[in-house]
UniProtKB/Swiss-Prot annotation:
Keyword Glycoprotein: no
Keywords, comma-separated and alphabetical: ATP-binding, Cytoplasm, Ligase, Nucleotide-binding, RNA-binding, tRNA processing, tRNA-binding
Subcellular localization, as worded in the UniProt entry: Cytoplasm
Task of the protein: Catalyzes the formation of N(4)-acetylcytidine (ac(4)C) at the wobble position of elongator tRNA(Met), using acetate and ATP as substrates. First activates an acetate ion to form acetyladenylate (Ac-AMP) and then transfers the acetyl group to tRNA to form ac(4)C34.
Protein name per the record: tRNA(Met) cytidine acetate ligase
InterPro entries: Rossmann-like_a/b/a_fold, tRNA(Met)_cyd_acetate_ligase
Cell inner membrane recorded as keyword: no
Known EC number: 6.3.4.-
Length: 408
């Protein structure tokens, strides 16, 4: 059975995601699709607008066969560790032939080359990176700058095209996926799909291909879901309407504010133990939490040229969930140690049987009695999310079985 993996967040699911699934099937000629999905917190450093069980339902109703949860440790990390966690999970299953992802650049050879260079870290690249960091650049900017100079010098590529390419978010993730495949010495074949529609950060609602950002902003500020009719698959619109009519609370970053401020009163000194905090950044964040009156104010006060909005927002989510209580810096350097099943259809059940025969890691359809440290963070993520979204029970992980949808 030819199986393709995809790495997704669905925050929320929209037409671009449906297009991705459809193109994945046609390009890879696969018989089944496994989606590794961020759970209740997503990589931009925010609670998911809807919970992971509803996201699983959205995925299964739109062409995915098996949904696995990306542990919170990886989903609340930089692109590098987000990609490594997800790719290592797919690799460990022992059944995945292709990894299909969207990017602004369709040149898979160039993306693979960039990933390989970043994994191998030639001396010339390391020296330039060190220089750019000394100049005060953020790590992501410094590394992108070093990679651009290396490619232009070693491979005679055009400066402007590389600069533009390295500033686009889906390209950045695509390169990290390729880097992770190189690091794992994986035989999984990377496949790139050209991203269409509005840019990732666009706030404009386009009739057909709107960004997740624009849809989230709309849901935050408007009550009329019908205006999203052309931006979402019909079944997704129905799910969101049903949730809205049942007084389901769509979840946004602002809801974190009182909990963060309260925790900061007693445990602010622990911020320095979070995995993405360095060079005194904890002092800026602790001060921001004391003085800010809104979530955006916290980030705008704490961020600098070197520490971007997304990094600060991830740190805030890590603090909210208690990442400082575990050795997360070590944990996230390791391969994903388990696969937790969130849902599947009939084809997904066949894939699951195949995985159980080939996987090098345990596959959980129900929670084990003794959770390892990484799984403990997943459980804490749901408990924390239940404070923000009152429709989710504190012990939801324990009372929810994988969602099973018959594919007709």
């Amino acid at each position: 059975m030819k199986i393709t993996g995809i790495i997704v967040e669905y925050n929320p699911f929209h037409n671009g995601h449906k297009y991705h699934i459809k193109k994945t099937r046609s390009l890879t000629n696969c018989e089944g699709i496994i989606a590794v999905i961020s759970g209740n917190f997503v990589q931009r450093g925010a609670p998911s607008i809807v919970d992971k069980w509803n996201k699983t339902k959205m995925a299964l109703l739109n062409g995915v066969d098996l949904v696995l949860e990306l542990p919170a440790l990886y989903s609340l990390s930089s692109a590098e560790f987000f990609a490594y966690g997800a790719v290592s999970l797919l690799e460990n299953l022992g059944v995945v032939k292709n990894l299909c992802f969207g990017s602004e650049c369709e040149d898979i050879k160039l993306l693979t080359l960039m990933g390989k260079i970043l994994y191998e870290e030639p001396e010339e690249l390391k020296l330039t990176l060190k220089e750019r960091l000394h100049q005060g650049m953020s790590y992501a900017s410094a590394r992108g700058n070093a990679l651009k100079e290396f490619l232009c010098h070693r491979y005679s590529l055009k400066n402007n095209s590389i600069t533009e390419m390295l500033h686009l978010p889906n390209n950045i993730l695509a390169i990290e996926y390729c880097k992770s495949l190189a690091r794992l010495k994986s035989t999984i074949n990377p496949v790139s799909i050209k991203r269409i529609g509005n840019s990732y950060n666009s706030t404009y609602i386009n009739n057909r291909f709107s960004s997740a950002t624009s849809i989230r902003n709309f849901l935050k500020e408007n009550n009329s879901l019908q205006e999203l009719e052309k931006a979402l698959p019909y079944n997704i619109l129905c799910i969101l309407k049903d949730l809205s009519h049942s007084n389901y609370r769509f979840t946004f970053e602002d809801s974190l504010l009182p909990y963060l401020k309260y925790k900061n009163l007693f445990y602010g000194k622990n911020i320095k133990y979070l995995p993405d905090v360095s060079e005194g950044l904890e002092n800026r964040i602790e001060s921001a939490l004391k003085n800010a009156s809104s979530y955006d104010q916290i980030i705008n006060y704490a961020k600098t040229k070197r520490y971007a909005y997304s990094r600060i927002s991830r740190i805030l989510c890590q603090f909210f969930l208690g990442f400082e209580n575990l050795d997360t810096k070590v944990l996230r350097k390791n391969r994903c140690p388990y696969a937790r099943v969130l849902g599947f259809n009939n084809k997904g059940m066949e894939i699951l049987k195949k995985i159980k025969q080939n996987s090098s890691i345990p596959v959980y359809t129900k929670l084990p009695k003794n959770a390892n440290d990484m799984l403990k963070l997943d459980l804490m993520a749901t408990k924390g999310y239940s404070l923000l979204n009152k429709n989710i029970a504190f012990n939801q992980d324990y009372i929810s079985s994988p969602l099973i949808i018959d594919k007709i």
